[in-house]
Amino acid sequence: MSASKQTILSVEHLKKYFQTASGQLHAVDDINFTLAKGETLGVVGESGCGKSTLGRTILRLHEPTDGKVIFDGKDVTACSKQEMKKLREDMQIIFQDPFASINPRMTVSQTIAEPLLIQGKYKPSDKEALNRHVRQVMDRVGLAQRLVNAYPHELDGGRRQRIGIGRALALEPKFIVCDEPVSALDVSIQAQILNLMQDIQEEMGLTYLFITHDLSVVKHLSNQIMVMYLGQCIEKAESSELFKNPKHPYTQALLDAIPVADLDSRHTER
């Protein structure tokens, strides 16, 4: 990492173990990395490799078993409950399934407004200012103003995920864990959401931890990519370098799994 880049996140020997009927599950096992402000670290691996648990442990949605998370100079792992509430203004998450992570009884405006009310940014009586803020967020994530009173079941997957992104952006955070935010969407919608997230990152100077099982998703989005397998980091490199020269056989297997349109071959077969 260049000396001119400011480190916003440092993860040191982070571990998260779960006790199961068959013994101890090492979901996250001694993970180390640093992330510069405004950059994206892609975390890639198959289902069950520990990548989502890593993201949630960094945010202390899971309590770490051991290790440290330093965010913007603060030791997240040592913060009190009250300190964590304040810190959550700067550390947010976008979940994989917008239908499961959004309250079906809340409208678009209520969902985006909820974190603002919880953090005391507005009082319920400040309706005009709160509504103005919500509408600004809706504009930022590409949600039409006519949807302000719509419910999740009335919207398609792409719009529901825009609500989830809007909710994460409402408090204007510095860092967002993006937990497979496009895996539940159609390919055409995936591209729209990825472009939106890139635009928002540039506009707001955001830092992303982007979790996915698909290397092709993070190829152009990430500055660095970390490959996880069975809770461990088996390879980490600059994005371009990892695609050109993978060091680990598992990384090569993930690259081989990316579909390639071989038009010449198809024409030859005809």
Locate each region found by the language model.
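A short, proline-enriched helix->beta-strand linker immediately N-terminal to the Walker B motif
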Residues: 170-174
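Conserved ABC transporter NBD signature motif
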Residues: 67-75, 87
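Conserved ABC ATPase "signature" region
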Residues: 75, 117, 128-146, 255-256
